[in-house]
From Swiss-Prot:
Pathway linked to the protein: Cofactor metabolism; pyridoxal 5'-phosphate salvage; pyridoxal 5'-phosphate from pyridoxamine 5'-phosphate: step 1/1; Cofactor metabolism; pyridoxal 5'-phosphate salvage; pyridoxal 5'-phosphate from pyridoxine 5'-phosphate: step 1/1
Reactions catalysed, as given in the entry: pyridoxamine 5'-phosphate + O2 + H2O = pyridoxal 5'-phosphate + H2O2 + NH4(+); pyridoxine 5'-phosphate + O2 = pyridoxal 5'-phosphate + H2O2
Underlying gene: pdxH
Official protein name in the record: Pyridoxine/pyridoxamine 5'-phosphate oxidase
Family per similarity comment: Belongs to the pyridoxamine 5'-phosphate oxidase family.
Protein's organism: Burkholderia mallei (strain ATCC 23344)
GO molecular function, a single term: FMN binding
Subunit structure: Homodimer.
Length: 214
């Protein structure tokens, strides 16, 4: 039997220093994301989204990032799903990107806001037809008796809307507006590099960079 405690990797691909990063964390994220794309990593656009319920119990799931700029990080989902309900109660959330092949993580913390109706409409219209139908067919996170019922619902929605299903009112975008963004680079002997960006109105870039102990 595999002994989990014995599984370990010594990271040594790169280093991370404040003198070498961009003072703007969104620019730095774009640099790292492009490097993940260039490395042809499988689905570098996946990220873990962590939320909490009314009792303070956390939950996490993988979602896909669909936009990142100076305003924040965007993803789309069902507003009535578990994550949607939790975000309605508590808009504080965290994101985690993990690019294991590059020995890198990016941690983002902040508050969630909904994107505009126009932004949600625009992205929904760009989705494949099957995904647009699925947004109507699935009552995400609800208990269902069988997959057959889900597939029957899919056929019903397809027959109703044809090639042009509109965006459901319960489906749309969220934007995480970050208060902090941490860049993590694996290093030998577990002495990893960690640079934390936090908002700082006195800084020319609007952000302060500090180094954290690993």
């Amino acid at each position: 039997m595999t002994t989990l405690a014995d599984l370990r990797t010594n990271y040594s691909r790169a280093s991370l220093d404040a003198a070498d990063v961009n003072p703007n964390p969104f620019v730095q994220f774009d640099v790292w994301f492009k490097e993940a794309l260039d490395a042809q990593l499988p689905e570098p656009n996946t990220m873990t989204l962590a939320t909490v319920d009314e009792s303070g119990r956390p939950s996490a799931r993988i979602v896909l990032i669909k936009g990142a700029d100076e305003r924040g990080f965007v993803f789309f989902t069902n507003y009535e799903s578990r994550k949607g309900r939790e975000l309605a109660h508590n808009p504080n959330a965290a994101l985690l990107f993990y690019w294991i092949e590059l020995e890198r993580q990016v941690r983002v913390e902040g508050r969630i806001e909904k994107t505009s109706e126009e932004e949600s409409d625009r992205y929904f219209a760009s989705r494949p037809l099957g995904s647009r139908i699925g947004a109507w067919a699935s009552e995400q996170s609800a208990v269902i008796e069988s997959r057959a019922l889900l597939e029957a619902r899919e056929k019903e929605i397809g027959a109703r809307f044809g090639e042009n299903p509109p965006r459901p009112p319960h489906w749309g975008g969220y934007r995480l507006v970050p208060s902090s963004i941490e860049f993590w680079q694996g290093r030998p002997s577990r002495l990893h590099d960690r640079l934390l960006y936090t908002r700082d109105a006195a800084s020319a870039s609007g952000w302060k960079i500090t180094r954290l102990a690993p």
